[in-house]
Amino acid sequence: MKSKIESYIGFAIKKGSVVFGCDSIERFKKKIFVLLETQSLSPNSRKVMEKCRVKFDCKLFEIEDFDFLKNKNCKALAICDKSLADAIVKVKEAEDKNGEHIN
């Protein structure tokens, strides 16, 4: 069963509201509402993501994996749709608060 976050990311991909990869996120000019990174992201890329978090004034979350994405080599992505980003933030903060995975 897919998690809610996986579903929301899937909706954002279908809508075309996702930026893939640290370099693309760093060069992106429009507003980004939430940043997501995997645990396997390199330390240098984590620094880039932190700079982007400050630049875009948004939240940055670490997620277990992105195996559900077709782009298997993707370890960082940004959501550019406010409503989907808000839904992801709500679910992720609830998970972090409760210390459990929400399906």
Residue ranges and their predicted role:
Residues F66-N103:
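C-terminal structural segments of small proteins and small subunits
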Residues F33-V34, E37-S40, K59-L60, K75-A76:
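Structural motif
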Residues M1-S3, N103:
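Conserved catalytic alpha/beta core of Sir2/sirtuin-type deacylases, generalized to analogous enzyme cores
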Residues Y8-F11, C22-E26, N44-L69, K92-A94:
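Positively charged, polar, low-complexity stretches
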Residues K4-V34:
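N-terminal first-folded block
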Residues K4, N44, S83:
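Charged, alpha-helix-enriched surfaces in structured cytosolic catalytic cores
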